[in-house]
Structures are given as structure tokens and as C-alpha cells.
Design a protein with these regions (language model features):
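Non-catalytic tandem-repeat scaffold regions and their flanking low-complexity/translocation tails
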Residues: 1-165
């Protein structure tokens, strides 16, 4: 089966079984599914389980579904950027993302970018994450920790996971 729904007939793009089969092979195929199916939580969940980037293409209400966002972030930490504002302020979801890719902290809410534990985990995973901490926390961390002061200067070589999560 061709998992690219862009060439599928309109009826197939709205056929739940057809679309489910497609997104199990290629999660981002959901981008060409009907609006109704992009809003279907089961279809969205299958898509993000296959490819976290699929969160970009699901309906807004699915971006606010905790289970869907957790699955997406578990596959691809950068998917956090497509989560609803409420879920970008969800400590557990943000922790899951930054443990996978530290720089994902840049997509967290302002409140969580000021959370010491989250920022320290992010910086341990990837030194580039420090620049996304709140100004106050970044200054505090740089003043209190010699190694973090060094991180803030950009003098540290970035880890290989700086590319993506």
C-alpha cells in the first residue's frame, strides 16, 4: 500500500481504515487525510506513534490531547513545539522532551523555562539549552556554577544531540 495519501482519492482520504493503514506506515501521511480524520484521536495517536512529527499535521484538539502529545514527544522531542500551550506548560511532558533532547526546552512555557530542575536536565543533555532558560534562571545558574558559566560563553563544544531529538 502506498502510504502517501496525497495521491489518494478524496473518498480514501476520509476512509478511516485506509488512513489508519497509511499512518501506521508513515505517520506524516496524516497531513493529507480529511479534516475529520486529522481530528480523530485514534488516527492521530497511530500517526504520532509512527512518527512524532505527525503532531504538526493533526487537528488542534489532538495537539491538546495529553496521550497523543506524550506519544509524539516520546518519538521526536521537537514535537513539543506543536503541542497546545497548556501541554507546553505540562511539567511531565516537558521533562520527557528535554530528557530526550535538551534544546526542546525552547518550546516549553515561560514558566517551565524558569524551572531549575527542567533547565538543569536540559543543559546536562545539551549545553545549547541554557540559552532558552529564563533570563533570571540563566543568570543565577551562570553566577553559581563554574561549569555553567563556561556553557554560557559558548566555549563548550555542543554535543551531537544538538541537531534534533
Amino acid at each position: 500500500m502506498n502510504s502517501d495519501l496525497s495521491n489518494a482519492a478524496a473518498g480514501q482520504r476520509d476512509d478511516r481504515d485506509f488512513v489508519l493503514a497509511a499512518v501506521k506506515t508513515s505517520g506524516v501521511a496524516i497531513r493529507s487525510a480529511s479534516e475529520r480524520l486529522r481530528a480523530d484521536p485514534d488516527v492521530a495517536l497511530q500517526a504520532v506513534r509512527q512518527n512524532g512529527r505527525a503532531l504538526e499535521f493533526v487537528a488542534d484538539q489532538c495537539r491538546g490531547d495529553r496521550k497523543i502529545v506524550q506519544a509524539a514527544v516520546g518519538k521526536w522531542a521537537i514535537a513539543l513545539q506543536f503541542a497546545s500551550p497548556d501541554l507546553r506548560d505540562d511539567r511531565d511532558i516537558v521533562l520527557r522532551a528535554v530528557r530526550k533532547w535538551g534544546v526542546a526546552v525552547k518550546y516549553a512555557s515561560e514558566r517551565l523555562r524558569a524551572d531549575r530542575e527542567i533547565v538543569l536536565i536540559a543543559v546536562k543533555r545539551n549545553s545549547a539549552a541554557l540559552k532558552y532558560a529564563s533570563d533570571e534562571l540563566r543568570a543565577e545558574l551562570q553566577a553559581g556554577h563554574p561549569s555553567i558559566r563556561q556553557l554560557g560563553t559558548g566555549a563548550v563544544t555542543l554535543s551531537r544531540d544538538d541537531n534534533e531529538g
